[in-house]
């Protein structure tokens, strides 16, 4: 929208400068055809013809239009960079420079939009990657906790076996087996001692033969 308004101002400035140059040589120039401008000009001409003093009304309208144009140009000078020779700018050169500046801003806007889209894609990728790493971390923690629970159960079973207590019957059976072992060891030692002292009188002892 601003570019269209600027183009209209550019055409108007070109027309004014061309008309000023042609007025110096004694001939006039036609303004490029524009539907809106033609309708406004027709309406203005009708108002001028209806007035009592056509020439003065036309001069007032022209003065008002030029004042608005100067106001727009001053605003344009404040918005765009003019360079070191800003005081020597004509209306046409000012509008051309403003047009170039608008194109430069549009190009910067396109580049910024492209960078923004690229950053948004990278943000989505990193977000998905973070979610994947979070899921893997939770699964790893769950696996480690399960393995530690299994090792804890095994150690508890070993402790129960080592700390097992025997009842009275189990102790008697264990004691009788140990007494039999002691009795057998005494017999063996008695037979071995008989070779140095008295002969062994137990049946089955080799000293009785």
Swiss-Prot record:
Entries under SMART domains matching the protein: HLH
Segment forming the signal sequence: none
Amino acid composition bias (Polar residues), ranges on this chain: 185-195
Amino acid composition bias (Acidic residues), ranges on this chain: 153-163
UniProt-listed InterPro entries: bHLH_dom, HLH_DNA-bd_sf
Cell compartment(s), UniProt: Nucleus
One GO molecular-function entry: protein dimerization activity
Keyword Transcription: yes
Keyword match Phosphoprotein: no
Ranges where the record places region Disordered: 137-209
CDD domains with a match to the protein in the record: bHLHzip_Mad4
Pfam families for the chain: HLH (PF00010)
Segments forming domain bHLH: 53-105
Primary location class: nucleus
Any one of the GO CC terms: RNA polymerase II transcription regulator complex
GO BP of this protein: negative regulation of DNA-templated transcription; negative regulation of transcription by RNA polymerase II
Region of interest: Interaction with SIN3A and SIN3B: 6-23
Record text on subunit structure and interactions: Efficient DNA binding requires dimerization with another bHLH protein. Binds DNA as a heterodimer with MAX. Interacts with SIN3A AND SIN3B. Interacts with RNF17.
Task performed by this protein: Transcriptional repressor. Binds with MAX to form a sequence-specific DNA-binding protein complex which recognizes the core sequence 5'-CAC[GA]TG-3'. Antagonizes MYC transcriptional activity by competing for MAX and suppresses MYC dependent cell transformation.
Protein name: Max dimerization protein 4
């Amino acid at each position: 929208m601003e570019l269209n308004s600027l183009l209209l101002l550019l055409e108007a400035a070109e027309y004014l400068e061309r008309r000023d140059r042609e007025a110096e040589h004694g001939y006039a120039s036609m303004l490029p055809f524009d539907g809106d401008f033609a309708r406004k000009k027709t309406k203005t001409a009708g108002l001028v013809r209806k007035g009592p003093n056509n020439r003065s009304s036309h001069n007032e309208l022209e003065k008002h239009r030029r004042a608005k144009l100067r106001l727009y140009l001053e605003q344009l000078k404040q918005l765009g960079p003019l360079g070191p020779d800003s005081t020597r700018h004509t209306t046409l050169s000012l509008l051309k420079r403003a047009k170039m500046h608008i194109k430069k801003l549009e190009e910067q806007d396109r580049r910024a939009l492209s960078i923004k889209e690229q950053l948004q894609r990278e943000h989505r990728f990193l977000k998905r990657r973070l979610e994947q790493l979070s899921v893997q971390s939770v699964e790893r923690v769950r696996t480690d906790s399960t393995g530690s629970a299994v090792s804890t159960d095994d150690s508890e079973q070993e402790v129960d076996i080592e700390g097992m207590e025997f009842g009275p019957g189990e102790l008697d059976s264990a004691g009788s087996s140990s007494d039999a072992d002691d009795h057998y060891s005494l017999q063996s030692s008695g037979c071995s001692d008989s070779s140095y002292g008295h002969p062994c009188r137990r049946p089955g002892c080799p000293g009785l033969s």
